[in-house]
Curated annotation (Swiss-Prot):
Gene transcribed to yield this protein: ribK
Disulfide bridge map: none
Keyword Endoplasmic reticulum: no
Pathway connected to this protein: Cofactor biosynthesis; FMN biosynthesis; FMN from riboflavin (CTP route): step 1/1
DNA damage recorded as keyword: no
EC number: 2.7.1.161
Function, in words: Catalyzes the CTP-dependent phosphorylation of riboflavin (vitamin B2) to form flavin mononucleotide (FMN).
Record text on cofactor binding: Binds 1 Mg(2+) ion per subunit.
Family designation: Belongs to the archaeal riboflavin kinase family.
Binding positions for Mg(2+) per the UniProt entry: T39, N41
NCBIfam families hit by this protein: ribK_Meth
The name this protein goes by in its record: Riboflavin kinase
């Protein structure tokens, strides 16, 4: 399945959460790569129901009495407008400030640099 969306700026929290050691290890286990400490946010025209694609669920954890939620990941391939691509994953935390129209994508490298992306660029997601 192919989905198209636009690159948008995030809330700046992805780098903190992806950088937490328990998340980093879990994402490596589930995706096969150690994620870059940050996410690429992609805004869709319609709500996206991740559960339709059998995502992999992961549990939350606790650090110094603070709880961090689990979530789901789905392996995808992301393409820029020139057709360059990379294997990466949609990550959907159980607790998020994003709408169901915004996807957070993790990858082993910084996607904006690797795929030469800027805000409002169209990307293709292949599931």
């Amino acid at each position: 399945m192919e989905i198209f969306g636009n690159v948008v700026s995030g809330l700046g929290e992805g780098s903190f959460f992806v950088g937490l050691t328990p998340y980093k290890y879990k994402f490596k286990e589930l995706t096969g790569f150690t994620p870059f400490e940050g996410t690429l946010n992609v805004k869709l025209k319609h709500n996206f129901n991740l559960d339709e694609f059998n995502p992999i669920e992961f549990d939350g954890f606790e650090i110094d009495g603070k709880k961090y939620f689990g979530g789901k990941v789905l392996l995808i391939k992301l393409f820029n407008k020139s057709g360059h691509s990379i294997d990466c994953a949609i990550v959907a935390p159980k607790k998020t400030d994003h709408s169901k129209k915004t996807l957070e994508i993790i990858a082993p490298i910084q996607l904006r640099k690797f795929l030469s992306l800027k805000n409002f660029d169209v990307v293709k997601i292949v599931i």
